């Protein structure tokens, strides 16, 4: 017998394939405060027991592979392996269950959302033993979240920078999103800001196309910002989209924005990638720029109920990677979002400590230990009649963003902005007086139309516009 064979035998190596559950299903395991916890919705192939499927998820997203390998004897699997510690049936779903998996902290690089996702969701979703797999939630322990900078500034610092308190902020996405020249684009920005909005915005796919190169757009938008500020006495901003084909180009655009003296830039964090986003967030903190985040591509990942990843996980990842705003659905507009589920991840974005609440889809108590919060952005198919509901649902710490609901005003861009600002001020005043916006919202808007012909015209245009499709984002 060779020395190598003797060594393998001495550590108990036995080649072959064994069930995952023998190693990775540990219902007796007591989770640690430092563990990263995951809740997976698992749909196994017919004939695969839940314990085996849950253990396979834990194995393939941590230390496991399809066969026994002799190098297992060179490390401590018990220290590094993921563990499926609980299986929870789903009422009314015979073929699905929730598998809870605990991962030891040492499996993950500090301060890297990229490494976190590569480990937990990078490979296991293509596993043949599973028909479908969805990551519903993650618990990020303080020991790990403290390795991240998080948002460049956070909610309170942003309000202090803007000197705006006691109400939601108002925004507008410039439309048409593609095709305008830089000068005409800047004109629309000026008209909206002059009319009373706090922000205007590049759409997610406005980067640097032949009809409008990024440098020209940045310059004309900066001119619009300064002109509107001088005329209104308010601090204004435009989300200048720095997203680019390379990280170097992205940083060049952010640096140019800072040199122009504008307050905020923007990034598409999913298409741009977490590594690029974290780099940009660090630059923004160091240089006093706010960072608006668009979630373009999120529905490819999060819209299916049984496969992919819920947006609450993407929201937590963004808070760690860094962003001061992120789009979060509207509940009442044209884009997906069920009320309680939406408010669940809105709280995960804004609050320091969020209790477990399965009625809102929150599987774990989350303690952010003073990491700055992120402002949720409500955007997509909303107009002045939605203002009471949006004010009541999202509260003051939010951005309400009306694209077509501003630029579609029959009198033009500036009157559209005036209508939205008047509607917002009326709703905030009514709420502060103790009125119930959920019940009296339409009456509040009608009363305000007496003092604002711009609002009256907007109410007439959009009085019958509704998006009455059922949401598929349900618990």
Curated annotation (Swiss-Prot):
Keywords: Acetylation, Calvin cycle, Carbon dioxide fixation, Chloroplast, Disulfide bond, Lyase, Magnesium, Metal-binding, Methylation, Monooxygenase, Oxidoreductase, Photorespiration, Photosynthesis, Plastid
Gene3D superfamilies recorded: Ribulose bisphosphate carboxylase, large subunit, C-terminal domain, RuBisCO large subunit, N-terminal domain
Annotated Mg(2+) binding sites: 201, 203-204
GO BP term, pick one: photorespiration
Binding site for substrate: 123, 173, 177, 295, 327, 379
Cofactor needs: Mg(2+)
A single Gene Ontology CC term: chloroplast
Localization annotation: Plastid, Chloroplast
Role played: RuBisCO catalyzes two reactions: the carboxylation of D-ribulose 1,5-bisphosphate, the primary event in carbon dioxide fixation, as well as the oxidative fragmentation of the pentose substrate in the photorespiration process. Both reactions occur simultaneously and in competition at the same active site.
Protein name as it appears in the record: Ribulose bisphosphate carboxylase large chain
UniProt source species: Taxodium distichum
Gene expressing this chain: rbcL
């Amino acid at each position: 017998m060779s020395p190598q064979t003797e060594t393998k035998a001495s550590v108990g190596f036995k080649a072959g394939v064994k069930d995952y559950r023998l190693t990775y299903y540990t219902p007796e395991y007591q989770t640690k405060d430092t563990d990263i916890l995951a809740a997976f919705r698992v749909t196994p192939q017919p004939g695969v027991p839940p314990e085996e499927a849950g253990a396979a998820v834990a194995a393939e997203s941590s230390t496991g592979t399809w066969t026994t390998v002799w190098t297992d004897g060179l490390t401590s699997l018990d220290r590094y392996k993921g563990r499926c510690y609980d299986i929870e049936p789903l009422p009314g779903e015979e073929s699905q269950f929730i598998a809870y998996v605990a991962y030891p902290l040492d499996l993950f690089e500090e301060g890297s959302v990229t490494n976190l996702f590569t480990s937990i969701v990078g490979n296991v979703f293509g596993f043949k033993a599973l028909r479908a797999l969805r990551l519903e939630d993650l618990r990020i322990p303080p020991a790990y979240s403290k390795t991240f900078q998080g948002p460049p500034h956070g909610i309170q610092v942003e309000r202090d920078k803007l000197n705006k308190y006691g109400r939601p902020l108002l925004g507008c996405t410039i439309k048409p999103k593609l095709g305008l020249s830089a000068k005409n684009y800047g004109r629309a920005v000026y008209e909206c800001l002059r009319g009373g909005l706090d922000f205007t915005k590049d759409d997610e796919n406005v980067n640097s196309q032949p009809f409008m190169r990024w440098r020209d757009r940045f310059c004309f938008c900066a001119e619009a910002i300064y002109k509107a500020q001088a005329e209104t006495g308010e601090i204004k901003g435009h989300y200048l989209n720095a997203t680019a084909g390379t990280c170097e180009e992205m940083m060049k655009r952010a640096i140019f924005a800072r040199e122009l003296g504008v307050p905020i830039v923007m990034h598409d964090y999913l298409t741009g990638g977490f590594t690029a986003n974290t780099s940009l967030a660090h630059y923004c903190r160091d240089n006093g720029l706010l960072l608006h985040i668009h979630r373009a591509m999120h529905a490819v990942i999060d819209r299916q109920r049984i496969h992919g990843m819920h947006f609450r996980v993407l929201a937590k990842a963004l808070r760690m990677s860094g962003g001061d705003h992120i789009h979060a659905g509207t509940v009442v507009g044209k884009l997906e979002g069920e009320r309680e589920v939406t408010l669940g991840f809105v709280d995960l974005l804004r609050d320091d400590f969020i209790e477990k609440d399965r009625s809102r889809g929150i599987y774990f108590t989350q303690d952010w230990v003073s990491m700055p919060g992120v402002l949720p952005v409500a955007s997509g198919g909303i107009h002045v009649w939605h203002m009471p509901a949006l004010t009541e649902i999202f509260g003051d710490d939010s951005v309400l963003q009306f694209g077509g609901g501003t630029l579609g005003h029959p009198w033009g861009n500036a009157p559209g902005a005036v209508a939205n600002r008047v509607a917002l001020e009326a709703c905030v005043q009514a709420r502060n007086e103790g009125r119930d916006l959920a019940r009296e919202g339409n009456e509040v808007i009608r009363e305000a139309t007496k003092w604002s012909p711009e609002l009256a015209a907007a109410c007439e245009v959009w009085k019958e516009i509704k998006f009455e499709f059922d949401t598929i984002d349900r618990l």
